[in-house]
C-alpha cells in the first residue's frame, strides 16, 4: 500500500550544515532505523535499494550521508574546506544527536534503532553509550572495538607499500608515533 509507505530524501540543517537524509520503507509505522555508513566517506544511500531489499518491509530505514560525504558534501560544496576542519568525533556525535532529534520531530517515534557499519560503528557505539535513552537498541556491523589498534595496523600495512623516503612515509610514521593511547572521546 503506497499510502503507508515512504520514500523521500531531505536536507535538514544538522549541526549548522545541510545534511542528506534518505528515508525508505513500506510502512511508516514500522520501527525506524538510522543507518550510519562506514568510511568516513562510504555512503550507501545510492545502493540502499539493493542492500535494504526485504528489510524495508519490516523497518523504515534512514540513511544519512555524513559531513563531507556524497550528497551532504555537494550540498555544502562552497563550504567544504571549512566543514572538513570540523570533522571531529564530537562533531559526528552531535550530528547523530541532531539527526535523531530531527527524525523524532518529523516521524513521531519514541525511540529508534541505531545501526553503525565499520567507521559508523565507532561513532554509533559512542553515541549509544552516551545517549541510550534515545535508542531501542544499537547494532554494530563490522564493529570497531579498538580504534587505536585499527589505525596502527592500517599504518603498518601502508608502510609496506608506500615508497621509502617519501612524504607519505613521513606522514604515516608521524601518525604511528603520535597516535594517542586512548582517543580523546574515550574517557572511561
Regions found by a protein language model. Give the residues of each.
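The serine-hydrolase catalytic nucleophile loop
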Residues: 40-52
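Short beta-strand element of the alpha/beta-hydrolase
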Residues: 30-39
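Conserved hydrolase catalytic core segment
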Residues: 109-149
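A short loop-to-beta-strand scaffold at the N-terminal edge of the catalytic core in hydrolase folds
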Residues: 14-25
Amino acid at each position: 500500500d503506497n499510502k503507508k509507505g515512504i520514500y523521500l530524501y531531505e536536507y535538514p540543517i544538522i549541526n549548522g550544515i545541510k545534511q542528506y537524509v534518505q528515508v525508505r520503507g513500506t510502512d511508516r509505522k514500522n520501527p525506524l532505523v538510522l543507518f550510519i555508513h562506514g568510511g568516513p566517506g562510504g555512503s550507501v544511500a545510492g545502493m540502499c535499494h539493493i542492500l535494504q531489499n526485504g528489510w524495508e518491509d519490516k523497518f523504515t530505514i534512514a540513511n544519512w550521508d555524513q559531513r563531507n560525504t556524497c550528497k551532504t558534501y555537494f550540498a555544502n560544496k562552497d563550504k567544504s574546506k571549512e566543514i572538513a576542519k570540523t570533522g571531529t568525533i564530537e562533531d559526528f556525535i552531535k550530528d547523530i544527536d541532531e539527526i535523531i532529534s530531527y527524525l523524532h520531530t518529523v516521524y513521531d517515534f519514541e525511540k529508534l534503532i541505531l545501526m553503525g557499519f565499520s567507521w559508523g560503528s565507532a561513532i554509533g557505539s559512542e553515541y549509544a553509550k552516551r545517549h541510550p535513552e534515545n535508542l531501542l537498541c544499537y547494532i554494530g556491523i563490522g564493529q570497531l572495538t579498538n580504534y587505536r589498534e585499527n589505525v596502527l595496523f592500517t599504518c603498518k600495512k601502508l608502510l609496506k607499500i608506500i615508497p621509502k623516503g617519501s612524504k607519505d612515509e613521513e606522514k604515516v610514521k608521524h601518525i604511528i608515533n603520535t597516535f594517542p593511547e586512548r582517543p580523546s572521546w574515550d574517557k572511561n
